[in-house]
Amino acid sequence: MTSLTQRSSGLVQRRTEASRNAADKERAAGGGAGSSEDDAQSRRDEQDDDDKGDSKETRLTLMEEVLLLGLKDREGYTSFWNDCISSGLRGCMLIELALRGRLQLEACGMRRKSLLTRKVICKSDAPTGDVLLDEALKHVKETQPPETVQNWIELLSGETWNPLKLHYQLRNVRERLAKNLVEKGVLTTEKQNFLLFDMTTHPLTNNNIKQRLIKKVQEAVLDKWVNDPHRMDRRLLALIYLAHASDVLENAFAPLLDEQYDLATKRVRQLLDLDPEVECLKANTNEVLWAVVAAFTK
């Protein structure tokens, strides 16, 4: 392991520990006995992440996983025809922040407002250690009145006609995520000439990590299919939904045999046909996750 890798690993570890300590202090200040089920679940999710065998360099965020599925291995860029991945990555950010206990939806109220009309509010402003996530979290925290999930996906993507809200756009997201993957040893950086201009590309350098990611997605809808989204790992469930919304899920299924492919797509369709409004009412669900799903499937 190089000294650079060691330094980056230590930095990530220190950031993660600092974030967890800050979040724990804030929860303690709010009253330990009154902590919600979501708080407990978010702590379990973070602990599960820490317990996984992968090194810090190869533990990927939802955004990085979706981008990795969309990148061409040798060329090092996403398809020029993919106009879905931009909004999909913003949806990943909202879910990632929710899974880390930073965001939640406002209470549904007596009249039970729908997922798409409920506002996103900041639950904790403790740093995540990820620059993009912290940037998005800062926007959510400082915005009054709050916005809905659908609005945040559009605002963070820059898809607004209101010039006063253009500052919400997160710029160069794909390039910044690719650089994160370069630092984690998954991609490398090259310059390619495209007739009239040069373009920075990020070809795959660690195929094992991508193959593990593809295998994880395939197994979720084949060998390890449980036919119940609430028994699936939340992060994996979100990955399947967001990979589909970003139009990159097909890349994970491309190597499958015809029968496996048909079964996998059938089961993904089962997930897409679920009603997020119904699913979010079940026990131990993450409402932001289902609100993002609703934004992309309604």
UniProtKB/Swiss-Prot annotation:
Phosphorylated. It is a peripheral membrane protein. The modification Phosphoserine is found at S35, S36. One of its GO terms (molecular function) is cargo adaptor activity. Residues 190-201 are annotated as: Beta-hairpin required for oligomerization. A 1,2-diacyl-sn-glycero-3-phospho-(1D-myo-inositol 4-phosphate) binds at W81, R90, R171, R174. It is found in: Golgi apparatus, Golgi stack membrane; Golgi apparatus, trans-Golgi network membrane; Mitochondrion intermembrane space; Cell membrane. Changing W81A: Abolishes phosphoinositide binding and localization to the Golgi apparatus. GO terms for cellular component: cytosol; endosome; Golgi apparatus; Golgi cisterna; Golgi cisterna membrane; Golgi membrane; intracellular membrane-bounded organelle; mitochondrial intermembrane space. Keywords: Cell membrane, Disulfide bond, Endosome, Golgi apparatus, Lipid-binding, Membrane, Mitochondrion, Phosphoprotein, Protein transport, Transport. InterPro entries: GPP34-like (IPR008628), GPP34-like_sf (IPR038261). Phosphatidylinositol-4-phosphate-binding protein that links Golgi membranes to the cytoskeleton and may participate in the tensile force required for vesicle budding from the Golgi. Thereby, may play a role in Golgi membrane trafficking and could indirectly give its flattened shape to the Golgi apparatus. May also bind to the coatomer to regulate Golgi membrane trafficking. May play a role in anterograde transport from the Golgi to the plasma membrane and regulate secretion. Homodimer. Interacts with the coatomer complex. Interacts with MYO18A; the interaction is direct and may link Golgi membranes to the actin cytoskeleton. Interacts with GCNT1; may control its retention in the Golgi. Interacts with VPS35. Modulates sensitivity to rapamycin. Tumors expressing this protein are more sensitive to rapamycin in vivo. This is Golgi phosphoprotein 3. It comes from Homo sapiens (Human).
